[in-house]
Amino acid sequence: MSMSKSKTFKGLLLTLLAISLVFALVGCSSSKAEESKKVVIYTNGDEEAVAAMETALKNAGYDGKYVLQSLGTSELGGKLMAEGSDIEADLITMSSYFIDSSQSKYHMYKDLSFTTNAMDSYPSYYMPILANTGSIFVNTEVLKQKGLEKPASIKDLTKPEYKGLVSIPNIMDSSTGWLLVQAVITQYGEEEGKQVLHDLIANVGPHLESSGSGPIKKVEAGEVAAGFGLRHQAVKAKASGAPIDYVDPSEGNFSLTESIAVVDKKNATTDLAMKMAETIIKDARKDLITNYPVALYQGETVEDINKPAQSMKFAKPLTVELLEEHQKFFNDAK
């Protein structure tokens, strides 16, 4: 073989080797890319909500195509407000007021590409997946033992005879506590409302709970006679035969929605996240409404026992800033 032919042959071998290396690297990186294309879902939902969403995604063929991480409302809210669209998540389910506030700050969500038949109007970038409504609940046996009249209002829980016998959620830790504060401010205004809250907190004493489910647990256990929390939990407890009753307070039943939104990463994963969002809205609701019985979409119905008698909305839009104002109001009332 001549020197020139030898060089040509070597050059050809080197070229083929280089090409094979490129294909090997592309194959390796594409497998990593496949991994990175999994939709990352952040949610503040509890176990029942997560189960409903995952069932819908699995039935739609998305098993193995997403990674779901559950975070507390304050933790996920903090990440949204600090990181904006740099957040790892492609899809979030979260308290609607946090979605509104993070959108105002960062414009981080993509308009939803699908339509729904929601009963109320919502921004173009999210739709509700569930709603929670506040109410009073009581342990009927403890009321009898203590000779207490069933309360008709939040203000009734400030009476001296209820001292040490009331449990409420702390607005500093739980959004359920915000439902109570909204009711007090709406009915009594800030001046009288502060006194009502002061007297209520004094009666609550050590029964101020960090979890929205804390009060119903204490009422069910008979540790206190009355509490404020999520209405559907009291309805469920009563239906199970527990000595629990629910009371729609005269100040009103206020609600908070949790919604789904797609973070606009402007890539193929964003498109897949959008399809998953549509699946959750359209397929998970049948399970979600069972555990959170508030009708949000046309055609949905709930039993009469799940319809609050005093359903109300706060006069101002719910935002993180308003929550912080009401947290200060609560602390100042102590």
Residue ranges of predicted features:
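A bilobed periplasmic-binding-protein/Venus flytrap-type ligand-binding module shared by bacterial periplasmic
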Residues: 137-142, 257-268, 288-291
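A ligand-binding cleft/hinge motif common to bilobed small-molecule-binding domains
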Residues: 97-103, 220-221, 225-243
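Extracytoplasmic ligand-binding site segments that recognize negatively charged/polar headgroups
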Residues: 43-51, 71-74, 88-216, 220
